[in-house]
């Protein structure tokens, strides 16, 4: 899990996106402050040396040195720049929570892939054990055949059962390889470098899930918090679009020094300045401002409805996950009973086979029932673990309340 958080490429891309959003927020916030720039120049010119009568009067050379500084500031009377900056900040917050969404999805996918790897390994071990059991029964049937108490049909049926069990192993190994490859992608490693050795679903500690989970836990879901931030950004954009209907007021100042002699450039008599105030009121723009305002209003409404749907969906996700945990727990318990009864029936049929009192049909049926019960138990264990992972994801990363802020790029 820790490795996936640090090296997963999806998380890295999401982190880069919220770094971009932070930069965009700083760009938008710059409009709230004055802009200041400075400059300097040296200008050389020479006048013509020819008079109107065509006589030469000698040209004049002029050198001008200038050092200046200019400042401009837009008075944000109507809050256009303030709302635009707030919208950018909320977008940056939304991108942080989007990174958390990607991280949560990655962690749950890693858990699911790991559990699938363990389940595949368990099923392969079960299949190999079943092959050994079936081969042991085949040897006993062959002994009966040699003793004259068995038939060719008995041997052929058991051989078919052994072959069928052996044929079940390659698909399981293929599934195991695919799950390991999926795990390798999540931790950004070559598949051949990922090894899960000796693990089993039986060793996984199952966390206790209380039935009375508080609804406040849903507030830690990053997708809900992302939608909240996106809605806040859209609301600020509406304010910025509304402000475009009103005049914009710009203040511009320019000051500096200008002299034909560099040594006298910063003398008091060489100073100059100017201050200009201007106001611009939109009169006719073909409906651009109105269209932009209506667009931002519609976008705000869209995100409001999306937010409502996300909240409703979150309750459904939790309910589905809790129901899945309950049903898979019941299934696992019942499947354990099935396995115990099947194992007992198989042991009795094997004893009767060796005593010569069991018919081959009974032996075949008890074997098949046991083999299916063992494989179904592994699948039931996996289903319960996947249900717990789905609840973890539905609650935004656990079932314990926590105070948590989104990850900051800085």
Task: Give names to the regions the model predicted.
Residues 153, 357-378:
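Short terminal targeting/anchoring segments
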Residues 5-8, 30, 60, 67, ...:
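Amphipathic alpha-helical coiled-coil scaffold segments and their short linker/junction regions
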Residues 1-111, 249-253, 283-293:
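Short flexible linkers and secondary-structure junctions
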Residues 191, 205, 209, 322, ...:
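Acidic, low-complexity, intrinsically disordered peripheral segments
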